A protein has these predicted regions:
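Basic/polar, cationic surfaces and motifs that engage anionic cell-wall
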Residues: 1-28, 92-204
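Short coil-to-beta-strand
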Residues: 76-87
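Structural preference for beta-strand elements that scaffold enzyme active sites
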Residues: 33, 81-83, 129-131
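N-terminal catalytic cores of peptidoglycan-degrading enzymes
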Residues: 1-78, 157, 173-175
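Short C-terminal domain-edge/linker segments immediately following a structured domain
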Residues: 64-69, 82-83, 115-118
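Short, well-structured alpha-helical interface segments that form or flank functional binding sites
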Residues: 47, 79, 105, 109
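A mature extracytoplasmic/lumenal domain signature
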Residues: 40, 66, 88-90, 134-136
Length: 204
């Protein structure tokens, strides 16, 4: 199932499952996480692997009425986490974003979704709690207990089964693939920055 929701509805849903999400995460010895993905599909193809899908026009869809449900979105990191996906990037990779790159509407929508979900779960919007799949696959939150790195740029398993979702966005702020950038141009840095902007605007 999928259902379109507003930001206010989503925040209430996340608030209602806060205790359950925290309990799940703490059972794994960690705090809750929010993981950001692309679906590698078209702009309007919704996938049940993610709690939240954002279509090309920036609309927000949930695939479960219970955001504490464990979904299959981030290998060995699913328990006590929320999976959010942009419906885009079919055929995308490190050299290009495919025929459906992230839209401006999706980028702004996901930033607002991050703000609302993190607020409801009492999470700071930082890399310890909010990560792209690429960052998570590279253990950039410092948690090395889940798996070895399997990022596009750090395939420690050597099997080619790697991830780099949203490592770059194809925008002026995040124009190209550069996982070693320190200038704030990586996709995760841009999205967290935008989410904190929206958070600060709401609290002003």
């Amino acid at each position: 199932m999928s259902r379109q929701v507003t930001l206010d509805e989503l925040e209430l849903m996340a608030s209602n499952c806060r205790e359950a999400v925290w309990a799940e995460a703490q059972s794994q010895g960690r705090e809750p996480k929010i993981y950001l993905h692309w679906t590698a599909g078209g702009y309007y193809s919704i996938f049940n692997d993610y709690h939240i899908n954002i279509t090309g026009d920036g609309a927000i869809y949930i695939t479960s009425e219970d955001l504490s449900e464990v979904k299959n979105h981030t290998w060995r990191r699913n328990t006590g986490s929320i999976g959010i996906a942009l419906c885009c990037c079919v055929g995308g990779g490190s050299t290009n974003l495919g025929s459906c790159p992230p839209t401006a509407e999706q980028i702004e929508a996901v930033a607002q979704v991050i703000d609302r979900v993190a607020t409801a779960l009492w999470l700071t919007i930082d890399k310890k709690h909010v990560m792209t799949h690429g960052e998570a696959s590279n253990n950039e939150d410092g948690d090395n207990n889940c798996h070895n790195p399997y990022a596009w740029w750090n395939d420690s398993y050597g099997d080619g089964d790697t991830r780099g979702d949203l490592e770059y966005l194809g925008t002026s702020e995040s124009p190209r693939y550069n996982p070693h950038a320190t200038d704030g141009s990586r996709g995760g840095d841009v999205l967290r920055g935008k989410a904190n902007f929206y958070k600060n605007q709401r609290q002003a």
